């Protein structure tokens, strides 16, 4: 028997609470929700952070610092092994080729990562390269062209 095969005995496992099935069950009538009020209703309760109409904490505290999220540069990553498998027999790989093969969305910024091996001399165009990817491409006799933008 292994650690992930351990389980409690059937009589030790708590049975599921079945509410609203008669007063003899102990959870009939109001089904553990108390008497009346917003929380007793279907779909009742308040959203997280709601303080009953009082100005909530996240609005009472001042904003601090600079939020760069809208301007954050995001890249779609492609590993070398996937790139080599998709372009077998081709030595010049441009961004348009990558978009055309469906390796990433058209117009996306592309970063090449160094997972996998390169045996042929490739000329690869992308917005960014990891250090290991650029090194592997150069060691195979190829060229890693980093584009602007």
Curated annotation (Swiss-Prot):
Domain of life the protein comes from: Bacteria
Annotated GO MF terms: rRNA binding; structural constituent of ribosome
Pfam families: Ribosomal_L27A
Family annotation (SUPFAM superfamilies): Ribosomal proteins L15p and L18e
Gly residues bias: start-end ranges: 21-35, 42-52
HAMAP family cross-referenced by the UniProt entry: Ribosomal_uL15 (MF_01341)
Subunit composition and interactions: Part of the 50S ribosomal subunit.
GO biological process, one term: translation
InterPro entries, A to Z: Ribosomal_uL15, Ribosomal_uL15/eL18, Ribosomal_uL15/eL18_sf, Ribosomal_uL15_bac-type, Ribosomal_uL15_CS
Record family assignment: Belongs to the universal ribosomal protein uL15 family.
Protein name: Large ribosomal subunit protein uL15
Reported function: Binds to the 23S rRNA.
Keywords of this entry: Ribonucleoprotein, Ribosomal protein, RNA-binding, rRNA-binding
Any Gene Ontology CC annotation: cytosolic large ribosomal subunit
Entry keyword RNA-binding: yes
Sequence segments annotated as region (Disordered): 14-63
